[in-house]
Amino acid sequence: MDFFNLIKNRYSCRNFSEKEIEKEKIIKILECGKIAPTACNMQPQRILVLNEKNSLEKLSSVANIYNAPLALVICGDKNSVWTRPFDKKNTLDIDTSIVTTYMMSETHSLGIKSVWICFFDPSQIKTILNIPNNLEVISILALGYSDEKTPSSDRYSQERLPLNKTTFFK
């Protein structure tokens, strides 16, 4: 499958089966995150892999992870991030989002589904998972095999703004 069709057919899955994700597939997903580009190659991503029942239950007490059998808590190390000198913008959110996108795309290519989650209180996650202060919780990528009907890839013609509303040539 070419890249365009891969991303066109990817969707946010919110119903996962109980089937565990194979260890070698988890490693491959994490490897894709490792090779994702980051500003000045600073690699500020720090990823907590939660696949044990106890850890997943703790996380699900403060964030809806849709009963996924695997959750990646994507954090950024505030001490290992590039900052643009002109306006002091740090790239922590950008870098970790690129890493997450790479992992999410690889997940789909392996037949595993995902949902990117940002609706949570980061301080609660830091507390229950004992995350150190130098790490900022950015997002959660919940992963698993789908237990729902795959939506049509034609949905984008109705759900997305036309290109001429989001892109400008000058």
Residue ranges of predicted features:
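C-terminal helix-cap and adjacent tail motif
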Residues: 3-20, 25, 140-170
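Short catalytic-loop micro-motif centered on adjacent basic/acidic residues
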Residues: 15-16, 46, 113-116
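Short hydrophobic alpha-helices that are characteristic scaffold elements of the AMP-binding
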Residues: 105-108
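Residue-level "edge-of-site" marker
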Residues: 46, 120, 139
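GST superfamily/GST-like fold recognition
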Residues: 112-124
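A glycine-rich helix N-cap at a beta->alpha junction
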Residues: 68-72, 130-152
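Glycine/small-residue-rich phosphate/adenosyl-binding loop
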Residues: 25-99
